[in-house]
Amino acid sequence: MRDEMRLVIVTMDTHLSSATAMAAARLARQYPGLHLDMHAASEYSADPAALARVKAAISSAHVVLVSMLFLEDHFLPVLDDLKRRRDDLDALICIMSAPDVVKLTRMGRFDMSKPASGPMALLKRLRGKRPGENQGAKGGRSETSGSGASQMKMLRRLPKILRFIPGTAQDIRLYFLSLQYWLGGSDANMESLAGMLVNRYAAGPRQVWQGRLPVAEPIEYPDLGVYHPKMAGRIADQADRLPGMRTTAKPRVGLLMLRSYLLAGNTAHYDGMIAALEAKGLTVVPAFAMGLDARPAIEAFFMRDGRVVVDAVVSLTGFSLVGGPAYNDAQAAEDILTTLNVPYLAAHPLEFQSLADWGGSNRGLMPVETTIMVAIPELDGATSPMVFGGRPGVRGQACQGCH
């Protein structure tokens, strides 16, 4: 009988929770003793019981993956726990997070607390500018435009380059593969991510797990596309495949959505919005882009041959038009909105509290939600901020005040 193997994921919110839960159920069924668990900062930052659960999970974990912990309210409650367990864990993988978190990464010979050397030093020299550097460049699209697509191309290329370099490069390769699996966050990719980390890093009495799990290459999904629940395959790269696109008489609304929610199958709030707009007699163009720069989606699906083909744009992302929690480029957003010259509204799902908490509170949005979801989009030029969805509260209880 194998020793138990515990993988814990700590991340910003719950948008990959359904995909992770499906992956965890399959792994547990096929490999008794293998546990995959996810904890969201949007829950434990405001709930002492949830914080106690994530601390206990980190304490008993063998491999921990941390992702998207940018905000101090999210990473400070667990930072000491991660530091305390760092050297005891089989591996600690920290991606897309605050520098204090990322530098805790330790995967085999790859230790991000040490000065960069060898392959990592070379990659840092090759990486170019980070998103947010030289913001607001004049003359059309800023330097950050299209960064999501270009970074994904590099991310897909790096593991192929590193495959043939021995030593620490193999651990660096798995770090970048972890990013690929995460950004393609379907249940299949989450299952392969867990399998890859177990196969490589299970240590001590858990070494019997090494090499036992089948691992597929990261499944690649479109970086840019459209979505509709009634469309075959749900995701496509051509707007002509959307229902109602052959009708030109109806007003047309462009919706901006997060790709990560779509890949994870966490789409009920989007589906509800699409249905509500269509019930009003509107043709809906729901679009997404890689990363948090919506301009490629706007240019591909809300414009044609330089001509604007939508009558209004509604962002459902909860973020700025160009940027996310770590940065935003209001000038670039202003430029593309000037080109569109149609009404631009920002609606947001509740990310850091449940609908029940929001509806039953005199406060309404939390300060971090007000900043990210209302104030920053207004700098872009968004109007009429509103809540359009979120996580339910206790099962079976209707939300009080959600109207």
Range-by-range predicted roles:
Residues 1-403:
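An N-terminal assembly and electron-transfer interface module characteristic of large anaerobic redox
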